[in-house]
Amino acid sequence: MYVLEVMSGPLDGKTWAFEEQITIGRDDAVATACITIDRYISRKHARLYREEDGRLRLADLASRNGTRVGGRALGEPEPIGLGEPFVIGRTTLRVTRS
């Protein structure tokens, strides 16, 4: 089980648990992790998913303001380490194990 945690932003400290994948966005109709209060986040902004080999991968879902990892814009989906911060809109998040 993984935990997606808001490190800083409008919902500081908020967490969501997931096993295989989680979609992050502003619209709870399409996003499992819904952050409605950050207007820089798209309806369906990014997805975290576990690959067959167990690694986590982060994908931007053609969001308007992009997804940033290590200060750079995310292009193609790429692996992300546990605890590694990433930014969507004005919100910084990370994934840990529960």
Where are these regions (language model features)?
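Forkhead-associated
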Residues: 14-92
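Regulatory inter-domain linker segments that are low-complexity and enriched
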Residues: 1-6, 12-13, 52, 91-98
